[in-house]
Amino acid sequence: MKKFVAFALVLAMAFALCACTPNEDKDDFKVGVILVGDENEGYTYAHMEGIEAARVACGLEKDQIIYKYNIEENEACYQAAVDLVEQGCKIVFANSFGHESFLIQAAKEYPDVLFCHATGQTAAKQTDLKNIFNYFTAIYEARYVSGVVAGMKLKELMDNGTVTDPHVGYVGAYPYAEVVSGYTAFFLGIQSIVPDAYMEVQYTNKWFDLTLEAEAANALMARGCVIIGQHADSTGAPSAIQAAHDDGTYPNVYSVGYNIDMLNVAPDVALTSPQNNWGAYYTYAIKTAMEGKEMQQDWCYGYIDEAVQISQLGTACAEGTQEAVAAVIDKIKNGELHVFDCSTFTVNGEHLTSYDKSYGFEGTELIWDGYFHESEVISAPLFDIRIDGITELG
């Protein structure tokens, strides 16, 4: 039921972008989708929801969408892309960071096909190809809001004497900018409520691994963490936290998930999850391709365009959380609040006033007007700064 509700929200948002204009070639239009996982993995499931919302909004039949599941970040991606083109796909999407170079390879060989890559950093800006595109959401905004949810709970636990140490944990997949940006936004959201909070990050070095994510959560609980967020794609961490709650080992530890509502697996401890509304992009891209119009080469939108959100609040959330969340989202939308406001964090005890990013963008200043302009130079996150108050464990 929760998955249906989530899909309904994405679908409604997709229709709001406007249904695709019919044309004589619509019945022949095919869409290829290369996925790093399948419906059992939260990140990929969110992309599947977005594609399905776009399919309905654009009036396509199910057999006009061709999926390639569990495609690793290697030559298999190139082979999948070629096969999709040979099956008649006019636009091909790939949803994992490591797919990019293989998608570029295919784009060079098939200039009349559009290739769109999620989370990429180079395709749209560092090639002369006109048929390669990057896309992401401003998920850091939703991660900040989820941090506010966590901070409200942490404050409640401290105010009532349940805990005395504002120790937070985070299960991260890899030490990439995407993950660093996300956990920093989450942490800053927490600190906006509990300024003394500090956080430890445990890496799994896998995007999706139930066992490793559960082990990371258990290790963080053993270290005294009372709120645990994640940028990893399974239900492993919330499930482990729920199990520790049920057996009394750690009855007062709470979870903030990612991608999907975690209340099904962690009903007593799940607070919320930051979520991408991928349907916003997929509807835009498919509609634009079908109409033969020029497509934005590097796309990123957030709360103001309904491309991100947090899931429903769990029953364990602190009183007043809904009101706090609404206020923060309003501030993000009207530009009053910037997630990476440099006055809210330090690096080695100093506030940053300048930061030049590499990744082929040497000399590009990312800090002006007092904050780091995430996902503005390119759609993919570039914030890889290790700020004070956060420790990476490995």
Regions found by a protein language model. Name each.
Residues 1-9:
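Positively charged n-region of N-terminal signal peptides that target proteins for export
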Residues 16-19:
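C-terminal motif of bacterial Sec signal peptides marking the signal peptidase cleavage site
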Residues 23-394:
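A residue-level marker of the well-folded mature domains of exported/periplasmic proteins
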